[in-house]
Structure formats: C-alpha cells, structure tokens
Amino acid sequence: MLLEGHQGDIFSLEFHPEGQYLASTGFDRQIFIWNVYGECENISVLTGHSGAIMELHFSPDGNHLYTASTDMTLGLWDIAAGTRIKKLKGHTSFVNSVSGARRGLTQLCSGSDDSTIRVWDPRKRGQCYTLNNTYQVTAVTFNDTAEQVISGGIDNDIKVWDLRKNSILYKLKGHSDTITGLSLSPDGSYILSNAVDNTLRIWDVRPFAPYERCVKIISGHQHNFEKNLLRCAWSPDGSKVSAGSSDRFHYIWDTTSRRILYKLPGHNGSVNDIDFHPKEPIVCSGSSDKQIYLGEIETVQ
C-alpha cells in the first residue's frame, strides 16, 4: 500500500502502540496521521513547527506525539485534539532526535547539533538536565528504566549517560563513522545502532554485561553522500531488525543469523525510516521520494 501526501522528504514514521494509526513527518514540517487498515486514508495533519521535523515518536499510551525539529524546538502533541500542547525550547541549533521514556513519568530526551543532550519533564517549564557532548548529537534514546540516555553522534562513539550522576557511564566503540539511528530492543537489554560506515550493530546494554558489549555486526544496507539520518528498528518480538538505506531498499534481517530476510523495493529515494507494526506482520517505510509504503511480511515460524 502506497501512502502519498507529503510535500518533501519523509524523515520519520512510526506505528501507534495499538497499531491502528501510523504517524509520519519530515521536510514539509507536517505530521500526518494515517489509518493503518482499510483504505489507509490520511485522517489528520498536525502543523506548528517552522523547520523540518527530524524525528517523531508516540508516547507509550499512544495519546501524544513527540517531535524534534530543525527549528531548535521539541513538540509535544495531543493526537485526539490535533494540537501542539508544549513547545520545548532550549537547544541552540537543529534538534536531530527525540525519545520518550518507556514507563513511569513522561520524560523526553533530545539530541542536537548544538552538541548537547537535554532531558525534559514536559510538565515543568524548563528542561531538567543538559548533558554536554563535544560533537553534534544525531540520535538519542532512553534505556529501559529511563535512568540512562544513550546517544550517538558524529564522533562515531555511542555514549551511555547516567542521569543520576550527569556523566558518561561507558562508551560503545566500534563504528567508524557517524551514528544515524539508535533503537532500544523490546526487552531493553540491547541497543541497535545504524551508522554511515554501512553497518548495523547490536550492543548489550545490561548493567553487568561483559566488557565487549558489541554482540552482532550486520551489513547489506548502504549510506551515501546525502548523509541522511537513516534510522533503525526492532520487531516487537526482537527476532528481526530493520534499517533505512540510501540504495532505496527497505532491509529486514534475522537478528540471530544476521541474514537478510527481506530487501523490499518500491522507493525512488533514500529510505530514511522504517517501523514494524506492534501486533501484525506489517512494516512501513518512509523515503526521500515523499512516499510511504505499508507492506506485509510473512511470519517465519
């Protein structure tokens, strides 16, 4: 199923936690909400950012959306009302990434070209913490308990920050180019990273993991001169991983064997973001060709 309507590159998309909706956004500064079933019609458009939206995520309960934009702000959106309820200011350059806490109180973390990571409590006016990184930050995510923020940037290292001490707990070294996407596994034990060195890596982020935390290196997809922030994702059961690719294909691998299970064609531009449906064998991809594909994959027993 092809979903059309965006006027520019699509940078980010995600299924609703219950699976009935899909949200997408990108260069045109608009957030589209689509029905996943039936005719897949566009049911609402949210506007308010004055710059490209680099990343969006649903809140765990599915009632809100979080967005990061090149207008240097984060947005917190009420999906039912179709309005932005909070505009979080503080970054001094493009915001490349946003992530929400999986459980507990609503917290957001963000990463920016201003070389900071910020952790926000949207119920309070200002941000909670600022973590100073030396280089631009391109991807962030919380760990499972939201006591740590995991960040990636143009210095090739993934950093795990302890929010109680405001310091780096440890670094995950191995990528040889910019980190473009980070995704925490469904069980919270592993982090998936996508980088311009044309590899995906899986890292063990459990507290007492062995010293060598890189457990898998996966390849097959491509990055190119466009330097888009190609994201990555886990299937709900953790058995598959997927990544954006500049060669116009949507790749899905088996997590254990690292084998390419699917190389899905159709796009005419870089595939920037992908997602797995939370309940069914459906995947989606968003591309610089302004189009979204929804497709079914077979369930491998």
Residue ranges of model-derived segments:
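C-terminal amphipathic alpha-helical segment
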Residues: 190-207
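Loop/turn-rich, solvent-exposed surfaces of beta-rich toroidal or solenoidal domains
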Residues: 223-252
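A short helix->beta-strand "capping" segment at the edge of beta-propeller domains
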Residues: 1-7, 215
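Blade-level signature of beta-propeller repeat domains, shared across WD40, Kelch, NHL, RCC1
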Residues: 275-301
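Conserved strand-to-loop turn within each blade of WD40 beta-propeller repeats
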Residues: 24-28, 67-71, 110-114, 122, ...
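Loop/turn segments within WD40 beta-propeller blades
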Residues: 13-19, 57-62, 99-105, 141-147, ...
